[in-house]
Amino acid sequence: MIGVVLVLASLLSVGGQLCQKQATRPLTAGGRRRHLMLWLGLALICMGAAMVLWLLVLQTLPVGIAYPMLSLNFVWVTLAAWKIWHEQVPPRHWLGVALIISGIIILGSAA
C-alpha cells in the first residue's frame, strides 16, 4: 500500500512541475493572465497533495529507502516532455532513465 502512496506522491509532484511548464507556454496577451493563474493554481494543488502523501510515506519507510524512490520524477518528466511537448530525448538520456529505473528496482527490492 505504501508503494502506491509513494508512486502517487511522485506523480503529483511531477504533475505540479508539468503544470508550471504549461504555465510558461506562449499565449496571446488577452488570455495570458487567466492561463497563468489556472496552471499555477493546479501546480500548487498537485504539489500540496504530493507533500501530504510524502509525509505519509516518511512515517512508514526509512528516509534512506523512500527518498531515492523520488528519482521516479526524472522518469515521469522525461516521458511527459517527450509525449506532451514532443521534446527530443537523446539516446544517452534514455540510457540514464533506464539506469534510474534499475536503481529504483534494486533499492526497492532491498526494502
UniProtKB/Swiss-Prot annotation:
Gene3D superfamilies (alphabetical): 1.10.3730.20
InterPro entries linked to this entry: EamA_dom, Flippase_ArnE, Small_drug/metabolite_transptr
Membrane topology of this protein: Multi-pass membrane protein
Biological process annotations from GO: lipid A biosynthetic process; lipopolysaccharide biosynthetic process; transmembrane transport
Keyword field: Cell inner membrane, Cell membrane, Lipid A biosynthesis, Lipid biosynthesis, Lipid metabolism, Lipopolysaccharide biosynthesis, Membrane, Transmembrane, Transmembrane helix, Transport
Highest rank taxon of the organism: Bacteria
Pathway as given in its UniProt record: Bacterial outer membrane biogenesis; lipopolysaccharide biosynthesis
GO MF annotations, alphabetized: carbohydrate derivative transmembrane transporter activity; transmembrane transporter activity
Occurrences of domain EamA (ranges): 40-109
Subcellular location: Cell inner membrane
Primary subcellular site in the record, as a coarse category: membrane
Entry annotated with the keyword Nucleotide-binding: no
GO annotation, cellular component aspect: plasma membrane
Coiled coil: none
PANTHER family registered for this protein in UniProt: 4-AMINO-4-DEOXY-L-ARABINOSE-PHOSPHOUNDECAPRENOL FLIPPASE SUBUNIT ARNE-RELATED, SMR FAMILY PROTON-DEPENDENT DRUG EFFLUX TRANSPORTER SUGE
Protein function: Translocates 4-amino-4-deoxy-L-arabinose-phosphoundecaprenol (alpha-L-Ara4N-phosphoundecaprenol) from the cytoplasmic to the periplasmic side of the inner membrane.
Family to which the UniProt record says this protein belongs: Belongs to the ArnE family.
Subunit structure: Heterodimer of ArnE and ArnF.
Protein name (Swiss-Prot/TrEMBL): Probable 4-amino-4-deoxy-L-arabinose-phosphoundecaprenol flippase subunit ArnE
Organism (species): Salmonella typhimurium (strain LT2 / SGSC1412 / ATCC 700720)
